[in-house]
């Protein structure tokens, strides 16, 4: 059994980790931790629906974690995880970090977009970007996983085969993404349903969203050249689910059916990626509460643009589910275990 701990359980991703790991056949949850002693209480007092788990939330204690955990999931806010990670790694504990603190390979880029000084720069080089389907071999050997963001997961998985096959123009990629309100965190979701619901709106327009450098970084790695995108996120009046529509200029005319075959070949054997048939319409309801990413595409022959639609559950494949998938890879378990 893999002994697991979770640091930070009061947010959506922490709760989702509990849901998945509590049913995982190869996992024993050995520790739950808050950021301070003020969070010490029994799990059932926070989440009554987990009353089958006789666990207490303890104050963060690295020495204790090192003794009872093989791996720790960090469901902490940005700019908090990098205060914790060095102590855990130095104590020999594997870490899967769900924040953005170790996703960007250049610390100056992180500092510019997150407006905070990175205090654990030397650990950035030790991290592996945890997009499970693209970095499997590196994840197997990793001590520190930087779990991808939800928007980047939909976009990068949606674009990767086209980028690697080289039949698209990397200039002028336009991405229009919609997220359920849980993507902005529990506090924001509560405020939304109190003050705005029902509503549908764009936010962080004109290149302001923090996931932009993450998407550009990984697409640039795939292509071998710098990629710049135009990205506009939106909030939907549903709790969970994420849909990204991606518009890319083609270098030459290729039939939709041929592109679908390229995608299926690229993702051959990857259980959680589904490439749909031509003319199949995607919706978020198809992936809710699952770790699947479903992708459909069609060439607009009039404009010679490739239109890609990529959907996930932002709390599962976009966060906690992919984190567990990465844990499975790290410990030599079937990727589908617990998922």
UniProtKB/Swiss-Prot annotation:
Main subcellular location: cytoplasm
Primary enzyme class: oxidoreductase
Entry GO CC: cytoplasm
Pathway the protein contributes to: Amino-acid biosynthesis; L-arginine biosynthesis; N(2)-acetyl-L-ornithine from L-glutamate: step 3/4
InterPro entries recorded: AGPR_AS (IPR023013), AGPR_type-1 (IPR000706), NAD(P)-bd_dom_sf (IPR036291), NAGSA_dehydrogenase (IPR050085), Semialdehyde_DH_NAD-bd (IPR000534)
Residue numbers annotated as active site: 150
A molecular function GO annotation: NAD binding
Segments crossing the lipid bilayer: none
SMART domains: Semialdhyde_dh
EC number(s) per entry: 1.2.1.38
Keywords: Amino-acid biosynthesis, Arginine biosynthesis, Cytoplasm, NADP, Oxidoreductase
GO biological process: L-arginine biosynthetic process
Catalytic reactions on record: N-acetyl-L-glutamate 5-semialdehyde + phosphate + NADP(+) = N-acetyl-L-glutamyl 5-phosphate + NADPH + H(+)
Pfam families noted in UniProt: Semialdhyde_dh (PF01118), Semialdhyde_dhC_1 (PF22698)
Cellular localization per UniProt: Cytoplasm
SUPFAM superfamilies hit by this protein: Glyceraldehyde-3-phosphate dehydrogenase-like, C-terminal domain, NAD(P)-binding Rossmann-fold domains
Family per similarity comment: Belongs to the NAGSA dehydrogenase family. Type 1 subfamily.
Function: Catalyzes the NADPH-dependent reduction of N-acetyl-5-glutamyl phosphate to yield N-acetyl-L-glutamate 5-semialdehyde.
Name by which UniProt lists this protein: N-acetyl-gamma-glutamyl-phosphate reductase
């Amino acid at each position: 059994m893999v002994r697991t701990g979770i640091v930070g359980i009061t947010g959506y991703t922490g709760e989702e980790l509990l849901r998945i790991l509590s049913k995982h056949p190869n996992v024993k949850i050995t520790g739950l931790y808050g950021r301070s002693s003020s969070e010490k209480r029994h799990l059932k007092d926070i989440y009554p629906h987990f009353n089958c788990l006789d666990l207490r939330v303890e104050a963060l204690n690295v020495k204790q974690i090192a003794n009872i955990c093989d791996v720790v999931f960090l469901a902490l806010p940005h700019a908090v995880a990098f205060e914790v990670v060095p102590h855990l790694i130095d104590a020999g504990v594997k870490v899967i970090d769900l924040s953005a603190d170790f996703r960007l390979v250049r610390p100056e880029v992180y500092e510019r977009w997150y407006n905070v000084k990175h205090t654990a720069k030397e650990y950035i080089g030790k991290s592996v970007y945890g997009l499970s389907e693209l970095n499997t071999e590196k994840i197997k050997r990793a001590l520190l996983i930087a779990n991808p963001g939800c928007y980047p997961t939909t976009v990068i998985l949606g674009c990767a085969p086209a980028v690697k096959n080289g039949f698209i123009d990397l200039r002028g990629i336009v991405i229009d993404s919609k997220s359920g309100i849980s993507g902005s965190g529990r506090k924001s979701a509560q405020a939304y349903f109190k003050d705005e619901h029902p509503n549908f709106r764009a936010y962080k327009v004109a290149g302001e969203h923090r996931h932009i450098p993450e998407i550009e970084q990984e697409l640039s790695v795939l292509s071998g050249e710098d990629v710049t995108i135009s990205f506009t996120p939106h909030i939907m009046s549903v709790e969970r689910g994420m849909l990204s529509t991606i518009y890319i200029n083609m270098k030459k005319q290729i039939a939709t059916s041929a592109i679908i075959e390229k995608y299926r070949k690229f993702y051959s054997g990857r259980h959680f990626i589904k490439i749909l048939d031509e003319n199949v319409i995607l919706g978020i309801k198809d992936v809710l509460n699952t770790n699947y990413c479903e992708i459909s595409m069609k060439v607009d022959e009039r404009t010679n643009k490739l239109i890609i639609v990529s959907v996930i559950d932002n709390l599962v494949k976009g966060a906690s589910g992919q984190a567990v998938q990465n844990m499975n890879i790290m410990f030599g378990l079937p990727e589908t275990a617990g998922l």
